[in-house]
Amino acid sequence: MVSVDFDAFTQGLGLTKYPFSVFTAEEEKEFLSDAFVRPLAYSPAVQAATSRKNIFLYGDRGTGKTALLFELVKASGPGSVVAQITDFSAIPITPSQSDIYSLYISTLANALLKRLLPTMAHFRRPYKLTKHDKVLISYLLQHHTSTLSRNALMDDLRSVQHHRMKRWATSTFNFFRSLLNSAAGAAVDMLSETVSKSLGLPQPTLGGAKEYLQAIDLSVDSTLDEARANLVVLQQTVALCKKVGMESLTLVVDRIDEDSRLRNDSELIADFLRPFLTENDIFYQQDLHFIFSIWSVPFQKVKPDFRSNKFCLEQVRWEPDELLNILNKRLELHSDGKIVAYAQVVDDAAIFREKVLPLANANPRDLWQLMNRIIREQYAQDSTSHVIKVAAMESGIRRFVKEFTFFEYYPRKKDARANSLDVYSYIAHLNKLADIRFTTNSLNAAAGTGSSTQNYIVSMESIGLVRRCEEKGPNGSTLYEIRDPKVRFAVENNLEIRRDA
């Protein structure tokens, strides 16, 4: 059989560029606007963004929450100021409201100082700062910034708190101070020597330069009452932002579940997330707008405590037809418009919908990885084909499931021992089931997990691998089912998933 290189093969499919080599919104920001297809959550969320309402997006990993965030930020308007929070290491894993407000203050402080610092030394600023404003800025510089050195910090504080002429006179004096000290020292030494000689006294010891004139130091008022509630400081920071022209403030809170301290444990993530969402008075601050992006598994644990009816709450998920639309759009963009539907590149569209699409787990990221595997299987089987055959789809699915990096969605704990349980250990137990639904007893009978069975189930629930069914099992027992379609496929097709595959 004649073989061609991979580029020639994909061109034979009708593609001008390969569309399945990157899998996250961050990796293709420039292309994202053209490729973006609106999920059901888009319309209500974008309306909320334009009307400055708080938005809370939740969904499974890979569903495109970050891509939707980018679109919502653009919908906030050209004059809006957006600050993103993706690093939570500055606050404890059991944060208080004060910790969270402090995180918000620090984030806004960085945005505020970027606006202020270029004009701090100007004789005429485009805004007038009161004494209270200056003290607040000084407080933010001292307590809510981490990138400025101590010397630069003090320079910035002086720029804010002292008049330009006063700073110039002080720096001029301090510059000539060493010369003045030397001159004064020489005069005093000469006088001392003359007096000593005339009186027949021992000569005085001549030391180094003496500090006859002390340096003038511009004091900094750092006495802002730190006992005041961080909420008040946050409100004052928002007001100051507005005063200097930062009218539309948006805080985007994303990737809470990716904090390594939380070990990908949905219970820990939920405990960390809860104070962000509950009893949070700042959500009612008129001049500050929030957009949250949250993994659905921990969010469902927090949702009963969250007054969601007061805000825009949208689940990001994709129905099969929506996934096909986004696939079609991607193929069209990477074929210069020659491919307008997936059916043009597959041999059997019905098989694709029935067997391939469900494995995508209702999210674009998995679909791109699945398509990548299927196309490569077709290349390996017949690189001269201009369509993807059913055999390539079937073998591509199996390789996709076997070789999928489950740590992407269920990462190994940071401090885990080599022999500790992880997602592959749990899948190995589930692999022994005869059905994707099970009870504690049926899992124990199949996998021999013994007295640890219930602990395993709790752990699998915690990471989102399995879920509890609404209906009951035999004799009223609790019934569970496997959530991940890849693991479901493995159980139904007796396919072993191994860490070293």
Feature map (PLM): residue ranges:
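Winged-helix-like regulatory helical subdomains adjacent to P-loop NTPase cores
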Residues: 2-6, 358, 362-451
